[in-house]
Each structure stands twice: as structure tokens, then as C-alpha cells.
């Protein structure tokens, strides 16, 4: 495509971000090794209406992982570390998992270690815009004395491994991760505006202020009761004071220099093997590739090799994607939390759209599957019972909300995924791609008892329920103080208007101070559905049928229910 036509199309793709009094993005595009597009849209600071440009500094969040991994790679190149090195040889406190964890397992995310962010935010109730210190991170890491799977058995995205890699850099070099990365990566490449922030009070020149929708920050009643404001946006920032998994602050201009280094390495020995190391996926125990390199996803995009990684945290979103064989790249930095839904490769994201332009791909819609689906939908009327309503899987606490639109049912789960289901007869529905089967079980009175889901080889059972306010006398047994000694965190459970209010005893850590409505048995569901989803809490009883504990249930399968809050009074 001609350069002028390409730039015109790129402007069309990005124009929705060109708004006054609204956050925006910085976009850089490289084609065949040449920078063809570099532009800012929207505002870096809404207080002073400062516009975004290529020198605006953004938090690029999880894009930090590739820089942390590069630090480790440099130390391996020096002979100061090895891939098969046992991490407990550096940090003895990690031996409590009972299994050898290697640097290889951390780099390629084949470790199964629980995510410290899940523990901090979704168990301890720390707010997204609060600071988390190094000591707090270590407390959460050592409190998780289990793994999801054996080392190297599976791949699972997580932040803990890269936090530990950052700590390994500091332990080996006797300097901070921030200083080591600056001396050995940023300065050699001329990335003069890039740094790893380990001090939330740091003054950042030309910083883009981070923003979120008002309800994203002020989602619980303990905030809203003090304000009648109707703002659409709020300032937001993830004030974590430790690097490794995140906290990379950078500019579009600097990331373009980083992108160039993939083709002509200027770090340390200048070896091309170093770049190959960064961009080659790791292997599982069975010899299969895991799809993840050193802080970079590695895959295929319409027949082209692609390396890429996104970033998301309070107030910011980012994405970097490179087609190395075509020497073409896309870099996007934004100062709004929800921009993460626009970037990346889901639902035709911005990065995907730009990459398609670069490779000359024309997206032609294939109506074949849709036509086939329409034929199946004609049978929808044969199912007489009304499926609409809420359902819960008591094992995982995952929720469904089933709705009906134009004689077609849609299943929306706790994570916001919506699945169109089609009727195949004999009380059986299937997803449009036929990968999921939903079997409706009814009693002799034709009342739905449950829906059985088969997703691949896995089965789960969802039971219908109605949220209900129940008499205060029945709720009284749940009241009291509950404590998790592992985390040094306590919650109070009180009754209010037929609901339970669970509140952190540390009033500053109020992210999970929510009202809960009764759902089924001893499970309660939060009234508010935000970025934390519909939150579930299940209480446990002893042999005398007395309430003895509660846990936060976990439909994301990170096992946060392993943290038990025991009733102490």
C-alpha cells in the first residue's frame, strides 16, 4: 500500500481517540524497518488540557516483563545465572512449596505459582491505586504455599514469577532492578525517558496522567456514600513500589529504539543469539512449545511470526507487537484503563487492525457459519422451558446470567464472556462453535434443576438461584470477626437491610468492602459487578452446624479460597 494511503487509513483507524477533554493514545508504526507513523491523540492531562505526543511518558505496565527478562538474559550471558538454577538457592523462603522452581520456570511462566496481585487485591482488599511495598509482596508470595500444577507441566500467565525475577536481578547484582536496567539496557539504547519505577513519589516529567471510568475506582458504597458527584472519569494509578512484573514507564519514542534493537542488537556483546533467546518460546515437560518467550508472547499472525505483549494497570493500557520477518511493528500507549479492551487481538482490536493493514490483509466476512446457525435456530421454539435467569457452579462459584433475545439464548459468565447457545433437541444446547454442550436437567414437574456444561473433557454443573434478602435472624449466625493468620488480614461481617456487609478491619484497605446478597446454601454474592466481577463468598460449618470460617470463592481458578478466614468471635 502506498505510504500516503496507509497514513490516511491509519488516521481513520485511530481517529476515535482524537477527543478533547479525554484521555488518548500515542501510536508508532514501523513498516519494513521504516518509521511511517508516529502520532499522539487525545490528552495526557485533563486538568491542563496537555496533548499527547511521542515524548509523553506512560506506564506500560506488563510490557515491563520483556525488560526484566532481558536483564536476566544478560546475567545468563555473563555466566552469573543459569536457566536450570534452583530459585531457592537464592531465596531460601521459597522452599515451602516443596518443589524445585528454576529460573526457566519463572521466565517462561511454567511455574504454577499463585499471582501476588490476586492475593493483594482480591483477598487482602488493597485498592488498585494504593502502594504495595516489597515487604508486602514477599508476604503474599510466601503465604501461597501451593502451586497450581507441577513445574513445567503447563503454561499459565502470572505476575509472581516476574516479580521474583526482578528480585533475582537485585540479589545477584547487589543493585536495584531499576538501576541495572538503566545501565545495561536503557542508556546503551538511548532510551533516556524510560525507567522502572520503585518509588511512587517519583516526579515524572511529561507524564500522562492515568484515568479510569468513575465507577471503576469508586465502585463500593464506602466511597459513594460521601459523594453525589456524577463524574465520568477519575484519576487512577497503580502505585506499586516494586518492579519486575510491571512499573515500566516509557515513551513512544523510546520504545521505537527498543524495537530497532531486535534487528541490530547493541546490548553487551551485540549477539544476535541474545535476540533469538528473547523471542524463542519455551518448552513444557512434554516437549511442546508454551507460546511464551522472555516476557513476550510468540506465535503466528496470518502466516507471519509475531512477538507481542500487552500491559494493563490502573489508569493505563499498552501494546507492542512485532512481525520480525517483515520488520514491521505496532506500539500503542494509552492513559485510560478501559483502552485495554480496544488494544490487542480480541474482538478485532486496534493492534490487530493495524497489523492487517501492514500485511495487506483484507478482512472478508465469512457468512457460512452464520447461515448454518440460522438453520439450527429454527428449532429453538421446540424448547418450552424458560432458561433465563442466574445460575451458579458451587464448585468454582462461577456465575451465569442467561438471557433470551429474539428466541436465542445467551450465556454471560462471571468474567463477562457471552456465549450464544443453539438448541439441538432433547434438552441439549451447544455453543455456535460446538465446543461447549449444555444439557438441561428438569424434574418431573418440568422445573429446571440444573444445567450440565461439558467444555472439552471437563464437566461442571450450574444450579438456578434467585438472589434474596433473608430475615436478619437467619443472617445472625454469619456475623462476627474473621481472620487469616497467613496474610495478617481480618474482616468484620455485619447485617444490613437483609444483606451481609463484609468490611476489612484495616479501613484503608477497603477494595472488598461490599454488600452481599444470599444466593444458595452458605454462598453470598456481591451486589456490585465491576472489574472485580460478581464476587462470591462461601461460609463453612463445623460438625455442629456452626459457622466457623469463610473464604472468597474463585471462578478464575487461582485458588484464592485456599486463604481461610477463621471466625474468632
Residue ranges, per PLM feature:
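Catalytic loop of the DD-peptidase/beta-lactamase superfamily, centered on the K-T-G motif
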Residues: 1-39, 179-182, 187, 229-496, ...
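Short linear capping/connector segments at secondary-structure termini
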Residues: 43, 55-56, 86-93, 120-125, ...
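Short, surface-exposed loop or secondary-structure junction motifs
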Residues: 45, 98-319
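Conserved beta-strand positions that form and line the central face of beta-propeller blades
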Residues: 40, 51, 59, 86-90, ...
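Residue-level preference for well-ordered alpha-helical positions
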Residues: 76, 88, 108, 169-170, ...
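Short active-site loop at a secondary-structure junction
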Residues: 16-28, 47-109, 148-160, 243, ...
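Hydrophobic (often cysteine-bearing) scaffold residues that line and stabilize catalytic clefts
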Residues: 6, 10, 60, 64, ...
Amino acid at each position: 500500500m502506498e505510504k500516503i494511503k496507509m497514513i490516511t487509513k491509519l488516521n481513520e483507524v485511530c481517529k476515535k481517540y482524537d477527543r478533547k477533554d479525554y484521555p488518548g493514545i500515542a501510536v508508532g508504526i514501523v513498516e519494513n524497518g521504516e518509521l511511517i507513523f508516529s502520532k499522539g491523540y487525545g490528552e495526557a492531562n485533563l486538568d491542563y488540557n496537555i496533548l499527547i505526543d511521542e515524548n509523553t511518558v506512560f506506564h506500560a505496565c506488563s510490557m515491563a516483563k520483556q525488560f526484566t527478562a532481558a536483564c536476566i538474559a544478560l546475567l545468563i550471558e555473563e555466566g552469573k545465572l543459569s536457566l536450570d538454577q534452583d530459585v531457592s538457592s537464592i531465596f531460601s523462603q521459597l522452599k515451602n512449596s516443596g518443589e524445585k522452581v528454576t529460573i526457566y520456570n519463572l521466565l517462561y511462566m511454567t511455574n504454577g505459582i499463585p499471582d501476588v496481585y490476586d492475593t493483594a487485591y482480591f483477598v487482602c482488599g488493597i485498592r488498585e491505586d494504593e502502594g504495595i511495598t516489597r515487604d508486602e509482596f514477599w508476604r503474599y508470595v510466601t503465604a501461597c504455599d501451593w502451586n497450581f500444577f507441577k513445574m513445567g507441566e503447563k503454561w499459565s500467565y502470572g505476575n509472581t514469577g516476574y516479580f521474583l525475577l526482578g528480585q533475582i536481578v537485585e540479589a545477584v547484582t547487589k543493585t536495584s532492578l531499576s538501576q541495572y536496567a538503566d545501565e545495561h539496557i536503557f542508556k546503551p539504547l538511548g532510551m533516556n525517558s524510560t525507567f522502572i519505577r520503585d518509588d511512587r513519589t517519583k516526579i515524572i516529567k511529561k507524564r500522562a496522567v492515568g484515568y479510569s471510568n468513575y465507577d471503576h475506582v469508586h465502585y463500593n458504597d464506602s466511597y459513594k456514600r460521601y459523594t453525589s458527584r456524577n463524574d465520568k472519569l477519575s484519576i487512577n494509578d497503580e502505585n506499586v513500589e516494586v518492579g519486575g512484573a510491571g512499573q515500566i514507564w516509557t515513551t513512544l519514542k523510546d520504545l521505537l529504539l527498543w524495537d530497532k534493537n531486535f534487528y541490530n542488537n547493541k546490548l553487551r556483546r551485540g549477539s544476535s543469539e541474545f535476540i533469538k533467546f528473547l523471542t524463542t518460546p519455551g518448552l513444557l515437560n512434554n516437549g511442546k512449545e508454551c507460546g511464551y518467550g522472555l516476557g513476550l508472547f510468540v506465535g503466528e499472525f496470518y502466516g507471519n511470526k509475531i512477538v507481542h505483549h500487552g500491559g494493563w494497570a490502573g489508569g493505563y493500557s499498552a501494546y507492542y507487537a512485532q512481525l520480525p520477518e517483515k520488520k514491521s511493528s505496532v506500539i500503542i500507549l494509552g492513559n485510560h484503563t478501559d483502552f485495554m479492551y480496544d488494544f490487542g487481538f480480541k474482538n478485532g482490536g486496534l493492534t490487530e487492525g493495524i497489523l492487517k493493514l501492514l500485511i495487506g490483509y483484507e478482512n472478508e466476512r465469512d457468512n457460512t457459519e452464520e447461515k448454518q446457525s440460522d438453520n439450527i435456530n429454527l428449532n429453538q421454539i421446540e424448547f418450552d422451558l424458560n432458561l433465563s435467569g442466574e445460575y451458579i457452579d458451587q464448585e468454582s462459584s462461577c456465575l451465569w446470567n442467561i438471557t433470551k433475545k429474539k428466541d436465542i439464548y445467551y450465556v454471560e459468565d462471571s468474567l463477562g464472556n457471552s456465549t450464544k447457545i443453539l438448541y439441538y433437541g432433547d434438552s441439549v444446547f451447544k455453543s455456535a462453535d460446538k465446543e461447549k454442550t449444555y444439557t438441561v436437567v428438569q424434574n418431573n414437574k418440568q422445573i429446571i434443576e440444573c444445567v450440565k456444561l461439558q467444555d472439552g473433557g471437563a464437566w461442571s454443573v450450574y444450579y438456578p438461584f434467585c438472589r434474596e434478602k433473608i430475615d436478619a435472624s437467619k443472617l445472625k449466625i454469619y456475623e462476627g470477626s474473621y481472620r487469616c493468620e497467613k496474610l495478617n488480614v481480618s474482616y468484620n461481617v455485619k447485617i444490613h437491610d437483609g444483606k451481609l456487609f463484609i468490611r476489612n478491619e484495616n479501613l484503608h484497605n477497603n477494595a472488598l468492602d461490599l454488600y452481599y446478597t444470599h444466593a444458595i446454601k452458605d454462598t453470598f454474592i456481591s451486589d456490585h459487578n465491576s472489574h472485580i466481577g460478581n464476587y462470591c463468598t462461601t461460609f463453612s460449618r463445623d460438625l455442629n452446624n456452626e459457622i466457623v470460617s469463610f473464604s472468597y470463592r474463585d471462578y478464575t481458578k487461582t485458588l484464592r479460597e485456599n486463604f481461610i478466614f477463621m471466625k474468632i468471635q
